[in-house]
Amino acid sequence: MVKATERNGENALENQLILVDEHDREVGFCEKLETHERGLLHRAFSVFIFRKVLVDNPDGTRTFRNQLLIQKRAAGKYHSAGLWANSCCSHPRKGEETEAAAVRRLPEETGIEVTALEGFSKSCSGLQEKGAFIYKAEFDNGLTEHEFDHVFTGWLRADSSPGICKQDCNTDSLNPAEGELHFNREEAEEMKFVDVEHVMRDVLLNPDDYAAWFMPALLIATEGTEFGSLNPEASDRLIY
């Protein structure tokens, strides 16, 4: 059953979603609930917010560790409740550009404004689109996610809060000393920063703890020399 909280406010299920073909070309619009009941392919986005942690090594040197903000989906979500997912995910509205939707939705879910991201300016949101993929996932409640998912990444500036934290901070949670993150409790039960290497391992060891789109989106978000790569087994285990 769809919870009442899903029918209120900006994220009500009756909002119009953008239906697309396999090339992300618009083919129509449909209400959110009907879209998921019928498993129609629609446009979506996933945002990954990263930060750097400064670590003191035994040899006296200092290095940075990359961390990702992840969320545990709230119990009232219409699917994937209680599973871990990326920092923010949603759908652009009818007539809304995908990046603009990500800029709008990020503070609504996480409390983080794009002004806190590296590269933000009047002409740049600070979010970078890394790629896109199509996936389909059926749920026990009869709903189906079938999305053309655009993956965006952003890095918190060192002077933003929470940005770079020192080794003695609690790196598994949001540190109030750096500025508490006021995330949307209707969307997420919990939010925390985790080491990228840790989440890459854990999603392979415990895939059932994560939302269906998380692993393929993570593969795209962490492409590049700064992250290394996921275990090659990850690509073989993806189902699109």
Write out the residue ranges for each language-model feature.
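A glycine-rich, hydrophobic loop/mini-helix early in the fold
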Residues: 44-91
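The catalytic Nudix box helix
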Residues: 70, 85-129
